[in-house]
């Protein structure tokens, strides 16, 4: 009734996890269906945006091309062409704030859609052409509504009665750009993905095992949290935490 979409993930050992998905502002999910297609069963939702109802297909998180990893926006338009600072065809998002995402480029937003188009502060895609990236001959960009991904671990089961402080959060990621970690969603530290050997291009999607050092307060539950606050790709394969133990 509240328009929030629910999803369930079931592991091979019958473990079950639930998640909820909220869309932009006062928009509401109305219904959901699984539609057989050539390569996979597509997830299609009916969503009310303002006075209109749209059918939207959720993008696969196993895209064939790396450029399509950046389809991390809702109700999106896919642009393919020369580097540009103006994107049109967005009349369905007039009056909304959108983001523009592309490989090797920082995400641009929030940007107000007016007259069915949006303009970025600079040309998207010009940076990697200036760097001589021969793999990039055409810009592929996505323009749409951003969403935030949040994950929080359960209480540390061991020694429940002792005080715990989270000192380090470790996670394994696949095709990830940008992430924050901490003792909770109010105290997060960014994953510093760039190194001194990097070019000036925006960091690309990485497959890595990462450790983020945090300064957690003493608490009884010993939880940890992750957040992806920008519309950038991330697949989390595993999460762990390091705790200091103390007496109550």
Give the label of every model feature segment.
Residues 1-248:
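Beta-sheet repeat architectures centered on beta-propellers
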């Amino acid at each position: 009734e509240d328009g929030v979409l629910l999803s369930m993930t079931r592991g091979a050992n019958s473990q079950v996890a639930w998640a909820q998905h909220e869309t932009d502002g006062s928009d509401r999910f109305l219904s959901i269906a699984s539609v057989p297609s050539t390569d996979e069963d597509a997830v299609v939702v009916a969503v009310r945006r303002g006075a209109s109802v749209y059918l939207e297909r959720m993008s696969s998180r196993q895209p064939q091309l790396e450029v399509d990893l950046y389809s991390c926006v809702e109700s999106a338009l896919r642009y393919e062409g020369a580097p540009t600072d103006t994107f049109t065809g967005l009349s369905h998002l007039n009056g909304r704030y959108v983001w523009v995402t592309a490989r090797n480029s920082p995400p641009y937003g929030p940007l107000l859609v007016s007259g069915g188009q949006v303009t970025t502060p600079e040309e998207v895609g010009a940076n990697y052409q200036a760097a001589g990236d021969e793999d990039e001959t055409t810009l592929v960009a996505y323009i749409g509504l951003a969403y935030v991904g949040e994950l929080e671990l359960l209480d540390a089961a061991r020694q429940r009665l002792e005080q715990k402080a989270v000192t380090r959060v470790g996670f394994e990621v696949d095709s990830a750009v940008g992430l924050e970690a901490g003792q909770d969603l109010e105290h997060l530290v960014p994953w510093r993905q760039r190194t001194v050997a990097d070019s000036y291009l925006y960091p690309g999607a990485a497959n890595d095992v990462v450790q983020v050092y945090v300064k957690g307060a003493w608490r009884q539950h010993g939880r940890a949290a992750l957040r992806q606050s920008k519309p950038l790709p991330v697949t989390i394969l595993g999460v762990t935490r390091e705790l200091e133990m103390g007496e109550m």
